């Protein structure tokens, strides 16, 4: 444990000599009448921090050192935006709002966001916090320093296919919404952020909720929620460009612009981006393009906004990973892979020369090609002084394929007859196929918000959504050495899936006493799912399933005074199996069942900005959260993958994730700051049934009733960021991440695991204001500064091998050794 904890203590010691930040408070009032405005929303760097009191007052206990953006919004008034400089001394800022404005983007997402009144655990990240880390890597790497988060990359350097786990739960258990619209694929529940490259450059805030959290649209949260907002309204014209280059020939170029307010009522914003990389893994290249465009109309208490964004990705397939002997150099072990047909002779030879950067494929166009176009129409409408409505219509169009060279494949696997040549019969051929997805996802969401001006004791939301997903799955043969009866473009399998999902929820917070707040939330969700047709192995995957879930939540907050708060909540989350749980069920495993999560969260928050033990106005912000996530029929990863790299899963009757999350943030004026998180957890299956296979691939139950660790669930995760400003405009940061051992399957076998690892990054940013532009920023990110050699993901499987003994085959995803990204950013 000390290897994870002591580095944080050491960083605290470095920060201790100069530890301070200051509070900001004031009163918000009507510019015409001077009357206070209770319930006005206060946002700092895009993150909602609370609302004004019945007297119109607000207080931010501790504003970190450095420049910030303070934003104040209220239904029926123009939003107010002003710069704010964090400093050790207390500041008072009284502001007056002009009538006629509208609660802008916040009204559209407030229905799914948590606050300090919802008794849940969450982390808010504003545009500035995201921008510090945004060098072109995918979103999981920008969230890697948040509590309980673990990021990994198939290609090794954060570009292309990436993965995020929170509390050991992968992307299929993390509900992701953009402006309240579901992003998770309805069939797989995954959020494939590779399809939206450089999305971070258009995000103005993210809220990361851990546990079940508040009710969300889309698939249920089984470990966390990512609530993303791109709804920033900038009233002044702007333009900026970000350009990065670094290791593995990695490039990022983007241009962003905004017109500001045009003709009193209209705004237009846009972005064009391109990210490209050769990847750390050999041939694991990425070519990613995206755009973002928003057109807004606001007048009085009405905001109408159309948003479209799109991404197109072409990535060389790296989802097979690297065989263990390629990393260890163990030739005897490599021979086992060769003897059992896991590797060809050529692949085994390359494993010895390429090592940990080995790639399974050599066919030049072994690529994944996909485009995803999003269209959203949002309405925010003030309904008198106490009510507001946020509503959205959405359409997502996705289509693409991955292309593969297949050696020595049977004609029968493609539903083709054998080829007769004279007296010979050919049963196999080399060929190239493409597996396609072609889909539409469409629907609507709404949130009716009640926040009385005269009394902020009660806040309530009634919301919901209806969504439909239509998805075609099919394969095409585009070339064959021996064509049989096929022709270019011939389909060899086809199935059509339909999924309908609708939900409704009601949520309220009530300040029963000055020190006691109550929270309640209830959601009803119904799903209908149907598949018709055959899959690539020519098996019939016809499926019919429907589910209805009731998910209640309740909690309470207790104010202890002096910046202290206790909170506790209990929430139920339920969700349906994903597509592969139906179509790829392994022999020996029962049909997949729906999962249930009972989530208990309890914690303590402490925030003071008026202490003096480290100097005047010393500020301290600490929190401790206990979680007990108890599952019934949890679907856990078996450690195996299907042929497109998707993890295979099985139900386990009883399991749990329990632990504590400790977080802290301290700062000293504008000179030095430290954020630190530590998660200690125990993740167990109480009655695991281990299935292996004999030489004929018949299932054999190896063990039953075992108490084992849940796969991919580290017991210790920590993250620490020490940042300082030794000179004006120059900011240096050290980022340290530790992750303990993770097991690749549920047998808790150390020979099927990922070793613990520790990674140190260095970030340097230098901002200039030369006069001919608003800002010129030079930045460098050195990742894995100490050149650690580690793998952050992997998979495993076992069977009775050619030797007659059980053989285990481990595959890993090595992460890049020391590498860098340098950027030049210009703001006009």
Q: Predicted segments — roles?
A:
Residues 514, 616-630, 650-746, 825:
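Gram-negative outer-membrane beta-barrel transporters
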Residues 140-182, 204:
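Extracytoplasmic beta-strand/coil segments of soluble accessory domains associated
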Residues 4, 729, 738-743, 766-828:
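C-terminal beta-signal and adjacent terminal beta-strands/loops
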Residues 238, 245-276, 281-320, 324-329, ...:
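Transmembrane beta-barrel wall of Gram-negative outer-membrane proteins
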Residues 369-408, 412-536, 559-561, 566-569, ...:
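Face-selective signature of the C-terminal outer-membrane beta-barrel domain
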Residues 59-62, 182-210, 229:
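Short acidic/polar hinge/loop motifs at secondary-structure boundaries
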Residues 388-394, 559, 565-571, 594-658, ...:
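Membrane-embedded beta-barrel scaffold of Gram-negative outer-membrane proteins
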Residues 29, 41-45, 73-77, 87-132, ...:
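Short, acidic, small-residue-rich periplasmic hinge/interaction motif at the N-terminus
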């Amino acid at each position: 444990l000390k290897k994870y904890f002591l580095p944080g203590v050491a960083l605290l010691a470095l920060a201790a000599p100069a530890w301070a930040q200051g509070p900001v408070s004031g009163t918000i009032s009507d510019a015409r009448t001077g009357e206070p405005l209770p319930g006005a929303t206060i946002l700092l760097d895009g993150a909602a921090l609370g609302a004004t009191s019945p007297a119109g007052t607000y207080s931010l206990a501790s504003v970190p050192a450095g420049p910030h953006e303070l934003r104040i919004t209220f239904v029926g008034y123009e939003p107010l935006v002003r710069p704010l400089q964090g400093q050790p001394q207390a500041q008072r800022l009284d502001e007056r709002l002009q009538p006629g404005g509208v609660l802008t983007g916040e009204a559209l997402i407030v229905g799914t966001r948590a606050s300090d009144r919802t008794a849940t655990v969450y982390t808010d990240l504003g545009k500035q916090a995201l921008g510090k880390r945004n060098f072109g890597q995918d979103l999981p790497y920008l969230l890697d320093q948040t509590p309980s988060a673990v990021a990994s990359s198939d290609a090794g350097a954060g570009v292309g296919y990436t993965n995020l786990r929170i509390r050991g739960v992968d992307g299929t258990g993390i509900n992701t919404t953009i402006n309240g619209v579901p992003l998770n694929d309805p069939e797989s529940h995954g959020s494939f952020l590779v399809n939206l490259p450089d999305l971070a450059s258009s995000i103005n805030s993210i809220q990361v909720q851990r546990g079940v959290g508040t009710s969300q649209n889309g698939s249920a949260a089984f470990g966390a929620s990512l609530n993303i907002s791109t709804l920033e309204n900038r009233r002044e014209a702007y333009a900026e460009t970000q350009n990065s280059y670094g290791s593995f020939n990695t490039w990022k170029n983007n241009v962003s612009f905004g017109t500001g307010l045009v003709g009193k009522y209209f705004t237009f914003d846009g972005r064009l981006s391109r990210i490209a990389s050769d990847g750390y893994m050999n041939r694991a290249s990425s070519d990613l393009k995206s755009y973002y465009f928003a057109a807004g109309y606001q007048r009085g208490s009405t905001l109408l906004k159309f948003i479209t964004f799109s991404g197109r990705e072409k990535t060389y397939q790296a989802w097979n990973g690297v065989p263990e002997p390629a990393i260890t150099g163990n030739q005897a072990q490599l021979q086992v892979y060769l003897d059992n047909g896991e590797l060809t002779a050529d692949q085994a030879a390359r494993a010895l020369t390429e090592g940990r950067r080995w790639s399974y494929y050599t066919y030049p166009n072994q690529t994944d090609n996909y485009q995803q176009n999003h269209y959203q129409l949002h309405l925010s409408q003030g309904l008198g002084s106490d009510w507001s409505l946020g509503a959205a219509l959405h359409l997502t169009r996705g289509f693409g394929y991955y292309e593969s060279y297949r050696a020595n494949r049977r004609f029968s696997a493609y539903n083709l007859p054998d080829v007769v040549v004279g007296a010979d019969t050919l049963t196999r051929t080399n060929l190239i196929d493409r597996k396609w997805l072609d889909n539409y996802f469409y629907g609507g969401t709404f949130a009716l918000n009640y926040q009385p001006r005269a009394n902020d004791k009660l806040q309530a939301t009634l919301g919901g959504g209806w969504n439909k997903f239509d998805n075609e799955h099919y394969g095409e043969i585009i070339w064959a050495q021996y064509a049989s009866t096929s022709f270019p473009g011939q389909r060899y399998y086809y199935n059509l899936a339909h999924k309908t999902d609708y939900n409704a929820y009601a949520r309220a917070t009530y300040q029963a006493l000055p020190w006691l707040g109550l929270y309640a939330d209830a959601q009803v969700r119904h799903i209908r799912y149907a598949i018709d047709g055959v899959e690539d192995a020519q098996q019939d995957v016809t499926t019919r399933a429907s589910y209805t879930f009731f998910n209640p939540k309740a909690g309470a907050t207790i104010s202890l005074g002096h910046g202290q708060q206790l909170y506790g909540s209990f929430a139920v989350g339920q969700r349906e199996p994903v597509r592969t749980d139906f179509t790829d069920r392994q022999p020996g495993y029962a049909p997949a069942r729906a999962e249930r999560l009972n989530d208990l969260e309890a914690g303590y928050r402490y925030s003071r900005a008026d202490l003096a033990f480290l100097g005047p106005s010393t500020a301290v912000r600490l929190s401790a959260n206990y979680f007990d996530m108890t599952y019934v029929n949890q679907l856990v990863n078996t450690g195996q993958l299907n042929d497109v790299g998707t993890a295979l899963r099985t139900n386990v009757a009883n399991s749990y994730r329990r632990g504590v999350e400790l977080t802290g943030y301290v700062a000293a004026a504008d000179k030095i700051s430290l954020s630190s998180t530590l998660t200690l957890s125990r993740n167990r299956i109480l009655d695991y049934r281990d299935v292996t296979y004999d030489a004929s691939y018949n299932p054999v139950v190896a063990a039953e009733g075992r108490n084992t660790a849940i796969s991919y669930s580290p017991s210790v995760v920590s993250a620490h960021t020490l940042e300082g400003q030794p000179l004006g405009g120059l900011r240096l940061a050290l980022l340290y991440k530790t992750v303990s051992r993770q097991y690749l399957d549920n047998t808790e076998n150390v020979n099927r695991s990922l070793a613990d690892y520790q990674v140190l990054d260095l970030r340097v940013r230098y901002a200039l204001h030369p006069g001919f532009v608003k800002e010129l920023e030079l930045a460098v990110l050195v990742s894995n500064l100490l050149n650690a050699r580690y793998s952050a993901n992997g998979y495993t499987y076992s069977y009775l091998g050619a030797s007659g003994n059980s053989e285990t085959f481990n595959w890993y995803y090595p992460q890049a050794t020391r590498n860098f990204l340098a950027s030049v950013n210009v703001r006009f």
